[in-house]
């Protein structure tokens, strides 16, 4: 079962969240037909969005990460609800590049580094809060760390990983965010840095030992306490009603033109691939939204 586990350590000076998202990322791979490198990029971004989304307190809140680094992968979009359930897509899911010299998938080259890492938080106000930073590496975790520090002023350490098996299915996927509370002592910071530097490979821990081992390695030398756990999944909220609302927003002239063409139209969801078909009569029945002055 995919899940997020949260813990605190160092007498409250450290907050850590771990995500295990193998099934979620595998579902995304199946929906979009992702090649291994594209799967790793999308999977890391889904994990990042889930970790950030589940930390929002407002009911029905949503968090969106958008990345476009100018690489062959195109843009990445990942959306999380306030429980960490996610959906997403990439511009070119067939993107596949040669492995790096260390044998790892070359996510940074696929994403590119000439662009922005943008986070939008919609908590039900008139306008969402939007923050952006320039991409650091295109490897996602480093970019997320930079965003949290520069845009939200939260010192953090992040790791994200996706292990793709020889048959192109997802063998492991997940990551963590460790955040320091204001006033954390230098000794705590140094110990955390050493622990993260010395830890085993992230996806190896998740596939062989599980989340608890990840907590033990990252928080070695600290007393830590689990404060919450809940399941997450790949979840799309599309519906025929939402598609009708989107069509209503294009205006009466455009709707009339589509109906007069005399052919059925199909509208596909970018997140889950579901197709919604409308006949000319159904298009005529859609009431256009009034234009706001």
What residues fall within each predicted segment?
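Interaction interfaces in information-processing and related assembly proteins
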Residues: 1-228
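Cys/His-clustered metal-coordination modules, chiefly Zn-binding fingers
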Residues: 196-293
